[in-house]
């Protein structure tokens, strides 16, 4: 069994600018850094064995700010990266380019859902019996939850969105 605390990164400059951040590194704002510190405070009593994050800067920095003083192993994986928005990466979110749409060169919902399944396989192979914190991103996190709960892709939208530095406790 794995006890997974799945969280989203802190607020970034790109979140504030309302752009398609996707797989850009991202830079935490002052508020995002405070959110990360608060996450560490909220979870200070949890005896984590390992810390995980996507390999994108905003997720990595969130873990380091929240838990860097614990001196636990911090692993990164591209499996937890946010959706790849393709040619929309770095562009403003507008009515003509909304989060509900995708350009032809973006990662599809099915591809993102499959990547979430690969992340769960990775967890089971490397972290069995552990309590793990994993910091990812809004869209991938919802698909990870769907995979753990056995929900089909069509039902992912039923899973509430993550706010910055929100976490959810899951067991697998």
Feature locations, PLM:
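Active-site-proximal alpha-helix that buttresses catalytic centers in soluble enzyme cores
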Residues: 2, 7, 11-70, 104-107
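Generic beta-sheet signal
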Residues: 4, 130-139
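General small-molecule cofactor/ligand-binding pocket signal
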Residues: 5, 75-77, 171
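Short active-site segment of divalent metal-dependent hydrolases/proteases
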Residues: 12, 140-141
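Glycine-rich phosphate-binding loop signature in dinucleotide/nucleotide-binding domains
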Residues: 44-47, 123-130
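Short beta-strand scaffold positions
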Residues: 53-54, 114, 135-136
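Phosphate-handling substructures
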Residues: 66-118
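Domain-level recognition of soluble alpha/beta enzyme cores
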Residues: 151-172
């Amino acid at each position: 069994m794995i006890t997974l605390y799945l969280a989203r990164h802190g607020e970034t400059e790109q979140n504030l600018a309302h752009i398609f951040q996707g797989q850009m590194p991202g830079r935490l704002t002052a508020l995002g850094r405070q959110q990360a510190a608060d996450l560490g405070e909220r979870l200070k009593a949890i005896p984590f064995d390992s810390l995980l994050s996507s390999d994108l800067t905003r997720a990595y920095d969130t873990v380091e700010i929240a838990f860097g003083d614990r001196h636990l192993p911090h692993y990164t994986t591209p499996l937890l990266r946010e959706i790849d928005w393709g040619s929309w990466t770095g562009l403003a979110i507008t009515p003509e380019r909304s989060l509900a749409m995708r350009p032809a060169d973006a990662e599809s919902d099915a591809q993102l859902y499959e990547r979430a399944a690969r992340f769960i396989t990775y967890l089971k192979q490397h972290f069995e019996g552990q309590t793990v914190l994993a910091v990812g991103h809004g869209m991938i996190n919802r698909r990870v939850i769907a995979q753990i709960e056995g929900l089909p892709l069509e039902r992912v939208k039923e899973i509430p969105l993550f706010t910055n530095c929100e976490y959810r406790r899951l067991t697998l």
